[in-house]
């Protein structure tokens, strides 16, 4: 804590500085830098440290550090504000709350593909960490000395949030000398309880349940629901053995490197051990059903460095329920003639969405009740239908007709965000440059996410020619509900023949520049939820295709 006098001086000084509003990820990172959770880091990495971390998993001082913690900005921030080496800037939250000053020592443009290959072992943007790096992270990194001013504010669960020094003090008060950390980004069920408690008892230690409440994988269950589940599962551990503390970490889903990173962080929080299980911090499977990392690759990497970083690993294989024994066992220990039971995260979500039974052997009834309250069935969740296609493809006509049709039997509020309507009321000052088109789609995505978050249906029908902005919307909206991308794939020749607004003719004559499909590209979706070519079908038939898809997938009933 700094004095009120010094805080006032900092605020007055900040009025004369350029400000950078931090993203959610950057806020997570700076909070953990300032608290000491990212020790030995004192600030965002400079260029030399960045290169050393990417290539060698070490800082230039020689200390192990596997994940680059960088502050990314766009080129316009540098050029518009005359940013150069030695410039001091103010770092703020979205509401303007002053966090820190940064005196810049490094400005560089990284090779993000090289970074992706080194950190994630992949450049496939189906991987959420790779996608964030290549499609969302800005093109310029800046590093330098931080002047800490105020930690980011949290209004939720203040009694469950601890800095490393606070948590170490708690351990001392309770007389805990050996502490096993259990990392999770999902609700805990019976198998997780068995793994965590067995890990602690094996090494005669106490247990810290240390879930991530910063950014996790897109589509994960929100942290409010998860924390309520963690609080309930605490009752199933013997009294005095287990503690819950929340970690405001922004995960990268980097598998082996992330496991090593998690070990370093938990060491800083005073833990002596960490549980590392199957595919720790992995993002799941790629679009072809293949894993990005070996099942125990994370364990192997942490084991290699555990002595050096000062934390021991408690490794666990996958746990399954054995019906004949009525208990959980490591999968490799189950005799072949016995039945192994398990429910994946995907299957659990399917059961919740469709009101199917969730057996007692899998989880506790109070956890199921909590999940059901926060995870209604599909037909009661918020939904965004995002149409994309060339001008004249039929997307606006289908979207309008679909809105009217759905209102016949839908209880959820339905909002149409048509491209022309949005341009008139939400983006009237924007032109048609790539930057402005992306901004227009981002605005549509934000409005749709708010509609979806509140249980409504948003029907969006812009051209949305660029894959990157569509993907950003998908990620944003998927945090709050369901996202359906509908590609109206009517070919250019058909759209140009229709040309109801005469725009194609003007584009061919050079009267309109940067017209999608003529002299500006349309990037077709690679894997849309639904694809419709309206060349040889009526509007009613196209609308019916969408209705049937929504019924089949359980989004409407």
Protein language model regions, located:
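Small-molecule kinase domains that catalyze NTP-dependent phosphoryl transfer to phosphate-bearing small molecules
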Residues: 322, 489-545, 553-557
